[in-house]
Structures are given as C-alpha cells and as structure tokens.
C-alpha cells in the first residue's frame, strides 16, 4: 500500500548571510491515527507497533509481518542480555585475582610502608616487592665507591706534612726517641700547646720515658760513641778549636755517663732507623736523656739552647712555655 509522505521542509535561510551553528531539528509530522504512523523522510525503514493491525489486507504474508516484527525485538534484547551475561559474572572473578602493578622511578629511600601508603587508595595491597636494577642507584653507587676505594691512612692526624726539622722544633722529645713510630708523629704534634691530662698525658709520658737505642758507629768508633750511656775512653779525643763567633758550651757536671764535650762534632749520633740526620738532633737528644739530675742549675727551652746561671741574659729572659719534660 502506498504511504503518503509529506513534502520535505527545509530550515529557514540564515539571517545576515551567517550560517547557523546548529541545524534546527526536522519538524515532526502530525500524528495520523488512521492505523499508519507516518515516518520522517530521513528514516528509510518502516516501524511496526504491536498494536498495529491491517484488517483490509487478507494476505497471510502481510498479516504475519507485525507478529514477526514483534517477536524480533524481544529476541534482540535477549541476545544482548545473553551476550552480556558472561561479562557480569566475570567481574567478581577478575577482582578476586590480584593485579601486578609495576611502578618505576620511585624515590631511593622508599620502602614497603611508603609504597603501601602511596598506592593503598586504589585497593588492598597484598605484597610489595622492591627490585633494584643491576647498576644500583647513583647515591648507593657513589657511597660504595667511596667505601671500597679507601685511600691509605694519612700518617698525620691533622693532615699536616711536617718537615723533620720543623717537627723537631715543635716536639723534639718525639724525634729524639728512635723507637717512636714516626708515621704517627702528627698525633703528638696535635697535642702541642695544650696542658696534657689523662690519656694524652699517659701516651706522651710513655714516649718521653723511652730511652734511645744505642747508636751505630759510622765515621769513627770513638767519635760516634761518645754519647752512649756507658764509659767511653776520651783520651784519644783532642780539643777542637772553636771559631771566634761561636761561644763555648756551658760546663756540665762531670759524670761517667756524660763526659765533658771538647769538640762540637763529638755530639753526633747516627740512629738506626735513619729517619733524620743525626747531626741535627744528636747532641740535643743525648743532652735530654743523658743529663744527670745534678745538672738542675742549667735548663733548656726545648729549642736546643741551654741557659746557665752565668748567662748574661738569664736575669731578663726566663724559660719560655715549652713542651719539654720540664713543663709536663
């Protein structure tokens, strides 16, 4: 049966030549209750409603169309429901299975509690595993490099590199003891200028009380053994004249352990360890450790200069604040 279609209605022309942003909706035709529902022209299909009847057409083909169409719509809904049925029961199953979440570029110091606090808002966290890469982090690698490649320990505690001559000026007692472990001299030098008490004083006194070992004769047996703590024959030594600008050494009390010195070169000692020249420290070391108790009238300022009562500067210059035995 031919269906009457209304003429197509076009939207009104745009005003001022400006096209409208949105096209107006197509007008709906007036409903016709004569048994046929008109269809807009843009739809290319005919809709059938279950209440629609065609009594004027006795044909069996046309009479079965509404029934078939009515049955097709529920079948489509059932098919959609059937297709979606496996999806709904599968959601709880998928939620029950734990998901593995990989997170990269987390801070180096993050641990399990930190990650649980960060990602716990998205669901229950069963386990947290932190995997470090093979290189390790930059901070950890640098720390390991510092710890493994240790430099040799500096022999001086405060990092100073002391010249033996300078060190002898500041701490001559330590340089006079040959059995003293010289690489650790800086430890004793660090104590200079301080009043030693307790542990430091005990260490200092231990080094100070150790006598030097016997010297080794080198140039001449009688000449180099003059400072050994045992009687040495002095008959073979001749007096040595001094230059006019050099003052003679003060007279010391005579004793078998410390015979009178007639030549300045007789005070040289060669030590066994060879850490420094004996010509520099020999006389002073022997004076410090071989001086008897009877020589209390003369005192030293720990710089190698000996002041006696007959010194013209004795009344003006007193003993300086030193680090020798007398001031301990």
From Swiss-Prot:
| Annotated SUPFAM superfamilies | RNA-binding domain, RBD
Keyword Transmembrane helix belongs to the record: no
A Pfam family per the record = RRM_1
GO-annotated cellular components: cytoplasm; nucleus
Q: Where is the composition biased (Pro residues)?
A: 1-30
Using the record's annotation, list all stretches that form the RRM domain: 99-172
Output compositional bias ranges, type Polar residues.
Answer: 49-87
Its subcellular locations are: Nucleus; Cytoplasm
Q: In the record, what terms sit under GO molecular function?
A: mRNA binding
Q: Which InterPro entries match?
A: Fox-1_C_dom, Nucleotide-bd_a/b_plait_sf, RBD_domain_sf, RBFOX1-3, RBFOX1-like, RRM_dom
- What's a single GO BP term from this record? mRNA processing
Site residues (Interaction with RNA), renumbered to this chain: 100, 108-109, 133, 138, 145
Looking at the keywords, is Disulfide bond present?
Answer: no
Task of the protein: Pre-mRNA alternative splicing regulator. Regulates alternative splicing of RBFOX2 to enhance the production of mRNA species that are targeted for nonsense-mediated decay (NMD).
Name of the protein: RNA binding protein fox-1 homolog 3
State the encoding gene. RBFOX3
């Amino acid at each position: 049966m031919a269906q009457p279609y209304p003429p197509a209605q076009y939207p009104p022309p745009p005003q001022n030549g400006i096209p409208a942003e949105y096209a107006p909706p197509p007008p709906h035709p007036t409903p016709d209750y004569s048994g046929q529902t008109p269809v807009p022209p843009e739809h290319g299909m005919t809709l059938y409603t279950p209440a629609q009847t065609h009594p004027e057409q006795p044909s069996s083909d046309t009479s079965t169309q509404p029934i078939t169409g009515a049955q097709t719509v529920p079948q489509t809904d059932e098919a959609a429901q059937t297709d979606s049925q496996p999806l709904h029961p599968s959601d709880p199953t998928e939620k029950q299975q734990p998901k593995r979440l990989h997170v990269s570029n987390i801070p180096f110091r993050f641990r399990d509690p930190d990650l649980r606090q960060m990602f716990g808002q998205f669901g229950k966290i069963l386990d947290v595993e932190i995997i470090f890469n093979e290189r390790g982090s930059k901070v950890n690698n640098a720390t390991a490099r510092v710890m493994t490649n240790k430099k040799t320990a500096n022999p001086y505690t405060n990092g100073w590199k002391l010249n033996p001559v300078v060190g002898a000026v500041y701490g001559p007692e330590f340089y006079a003891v040959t059995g003293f472990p010289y690489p650790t001299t800086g430890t004793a030098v660090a104590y200079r200028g301080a009043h030693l008490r307790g542990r430091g004083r005990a260490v200092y006194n231990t080094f100070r009380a150790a006598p030097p070992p016997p010297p080794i004769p080198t140039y001449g047996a009688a000449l180099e053994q003059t400072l050994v703590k045992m009687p040495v024959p002095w008959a073979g030594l001749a007096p040595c004249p001094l230059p006019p600008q050099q003052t003679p050494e003060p007279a010391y009390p005579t004793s078998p352990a410390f015979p009178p010195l007639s030549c300045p070169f007789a005070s040289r000692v060669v030590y066994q360890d060879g850490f420094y020249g004996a010509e520099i420290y020999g006389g002073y070391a022997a004076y410090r450790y071989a001086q008897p108790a009877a020589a209390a009238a003369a005192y030293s300022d720990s710089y190698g200069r000996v002041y006696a009562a007959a010194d013209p500067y004795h009344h003006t210059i007193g003993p300086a604040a030193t680090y020798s035995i007398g001031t301990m």
